[in-house]
């Protein structure tokens, strides 16, 4: 169920009861002898058994932890899923998912993906006998043409990182599931559970780098996976226990706490992101702005059909050269020059040199990851302060053209 929101800019209505579920799901005080309202941090690595092989739900913290269990139950509800698993990082989740495959199987990955995902597929997974194909999955015909009898997994991000292409999840699911037992994975990191529910659109697995919006405070490294298949869940749980890709109880506690403000944070990210995107689009020192919330985005209508809003992720091309981009980034005062995204603080980075430097230069050029492409993670500060900071940094990068206003 979804509820109407007059400030949604034409996007889908917000998911009903989201804030209530984020605060209460999996947090029931009755599960603790102390009736604690806030789930405690369970640091114990092992748990007493009543008799050999008879435990009360937990035996060893790698295979299950009470604090992680609270987080997983909450995330499952927010994703509209039956199951959720917390991992030590987003890449730990990615590695575990690919272990569902055997050597010789093919992974089709969206060509524009997080640099770490690209690096893992290209330089690690391929070395273990997996066939990797990078395809523009925003074009259904290209995805269809890339599928072979060896295809076992399709991996997409929407919006993509850093070019912010939107992919029609439902269309991808229809194509993928025509071909038998292929798993469709959607990296939902940029949108978070608040703005997009991939499982409801046909994805088999929804995954996150929870380091970003889901936690939202830049103090946790974690991955999350949500799904509805009991078979896939059992297999992933086994693989996670076997590979050891588990998060610490403290990180689970922090991420669980971060979920409680996910709704209010994402609404503010949307408000600030839209304001900054509109400001940049009208700025004479900016060549082009990429933001799915803007009508100028080539897949704006798809974004409105598929999502309930947009996060604070904006990419734009500054006019000039690498020198101008670097000067701009070094001149920022409120935006911090740093990798990562999705925290309450605003960040800026240069993908070609930072997050996507491991992507081959020839591929970067084809994708549009040029030396003048800047990625912003717009935080929760006062939006006018953010726009003022961007304006002064743009003028610093182009001092001879700074007299435009």
From Swiss-Prot:
It is found in: Cytoplasm. Keywords: Amino-acid biosynthesis, Calmodulin-binding, Cysteine biosynthesis, Cytoplasm, Lipid metabolism, Lyase, Pyridoxal phosphate. Substrate binds at residues 62, 114, 119, 339. InterPro entries: Cys/Met-Metab_PyrdxlP-dep_enz (IPR000277), Cys_met_metab_PP (IPR054542), PyrdxlP-dep_Trfase (IPR015424), PyrdxlP-dep_Trfase_major (IPR015421), PyrdxlP-dep_Trfase_small (IPR015422). Pathway: Amino-acid biosynthesis; L-cysteine biosynthesis; L-cysteine from L-homocysteine and L-serine: step 2/2. Its EC number is 4.4.1.1, 4.4.1.2. It catalyses: L,L-cystathionine + H2O = 2-oxobutanoate + L-cysteine + NH4(+); L-cysteine + H2O = hydrogen sulfide + pyruvate + NH4(+) + H(+); L-homocysteine + H2O = 2-oxobutanoate + hydrogen sulfide + NH4(+) + H(+); L-homoserine = 2-oxobutanoate + NH4(+). The modification N6-(pyridoxal phosphate)lysine is found at residue 212. Its main location: cytoplasm. GO terms for molecular function: calmodulin binding; cystathionine gamma-lyase activity; homocysteine desulfhydrase activity; L-cysteine desulfhydrase activity; L-cystine L-cysteine-lyase (deaminating); pyridoxal phosphate binding; selenocystathionine gamma-lyase activity. GO terms for biological process: cysteine biosynthetic process; cysteine biosynthetic process via cystathionine; hydrogen sulfide biosynthetic process; lipid metabolic process; negative regulation of apoptotic process; positive regulation of canonical NF-kappaB signal transduction; positive regulation of NF-kappaB transcription factor activity; protein sulfhydration. The keyword Lipid metabolism applies. Its cofactor is pyridoxal 5'-phosphate. CDD domains: CGS_like. It is an enzyme of class 4 (lyase). The keyword Zinc does not apply. It comes from the Eukaryota. Catalyzes the last step in the trans-sulfuration pathway from L-methionine to L-cysteine in a pyridoxal-5'-phosphate (PLP)-dependent manner, which consists on cleaving the L,L-cystathionine molecule into L-cysteine, ammonia and 2-oxobutanoate. Part of the L-cysteine derived from the trans-sulfuration pathway is utilized for biosynthesis of the ubiquitous antioxidant glutathione. Besides its role in the conversion of L-cystathionine into L-cysteine, it utilizes L-cysteine and L-homocysteine as substrates (at much lower rates than L,L-cystathionine) to produce hydrogen sulfide (H2S). PANTHER family: CYSTATHIONINE GAMMA-LYASE, TRANS-SULFURATION ENZYME FAMILY MEMBER. This is Cystathionine gamma-lyase. It comes from Sus scrofa (Pig). The gene is CTH.
């Amino acid at each position: 169920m979804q509820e109407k929101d007059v400030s949604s800019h034409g996007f889908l209505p917000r998911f009903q009861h989201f804030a209530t579920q984020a605060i209460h799901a999996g947090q029931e005080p009755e599960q603790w002898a102390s009736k604690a309202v806030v789930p405690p941090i369970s640091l114990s690595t092992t748990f007493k058994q009543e008799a050999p092989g008879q435990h009360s739900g937990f035996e060893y913290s790698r295979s299950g932890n009470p604090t992680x269990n609270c987080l997983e139950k909450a995330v499952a509800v927010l994703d509209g899923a039956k199951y959720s698993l917390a991992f030590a990082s987003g890449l730990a989740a990615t590695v575990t998912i690919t272990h569902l495959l055997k050597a010789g199987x093919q992974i089709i990955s969206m060509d524009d993906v997080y640099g770490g995902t690209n690096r893992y597929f290209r330089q690690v997974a391929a070395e273990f006998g997996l066939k990797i194909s990078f395809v523009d999955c925003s074009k259904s015909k290209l995805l269809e043409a890339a599928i072979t009898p060896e295809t076992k997994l399709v991996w997409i991000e929407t919006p993509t990182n850093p070019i912010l292409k939107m992919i029609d999840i439902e269309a991808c699911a229809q194509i993928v599931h025509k071909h038998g037992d292929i798993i469709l994975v959607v990296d939902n990191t940029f949108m978070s559970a608040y703005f997009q529910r991939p499982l409801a659109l046909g994805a088999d697995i929804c995954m996150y780098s929870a380091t970003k919006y889901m936690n939202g405070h830049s103090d946790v490294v974690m991955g999350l996976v949500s799904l509805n298949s009991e078979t896939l869940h059992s297999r992933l749980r086994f693989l996670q226990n076997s590979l050891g890709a588990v998060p610490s109880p403290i990180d689970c506690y922090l991420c669980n706490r971060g979920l409680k403000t996910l709704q209010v944070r994402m609404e503010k990210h949307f408000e600030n992101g839209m304001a900054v995107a509109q400001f940049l689009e009208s700025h004479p020192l900016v060549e082009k702005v990429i933001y799915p919330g803007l009508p100028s985005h080539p897949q704006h209508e798809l974004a409105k059909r598929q999502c309930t809003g947009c996060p604070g992720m904006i990419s734009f091309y500054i006019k000039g050269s690498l020198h101008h981009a670097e000067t701009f980034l070094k001149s920022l005062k409120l935006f911090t020059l740093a990798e990562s995204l999705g925290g309450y603080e605003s960040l800026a980075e240069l993908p070609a040199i930072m997050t996507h430097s491991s992507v081959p230069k020839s591929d970067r050029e084809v994708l549009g990851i040029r030396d003048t492409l800047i990625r912003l993670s717009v935080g929760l500060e006062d939006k006018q302060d953010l726009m003022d900071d961007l304006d002064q940094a743009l003028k610093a990068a182009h001092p001879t053209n700074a007299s435009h206003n």
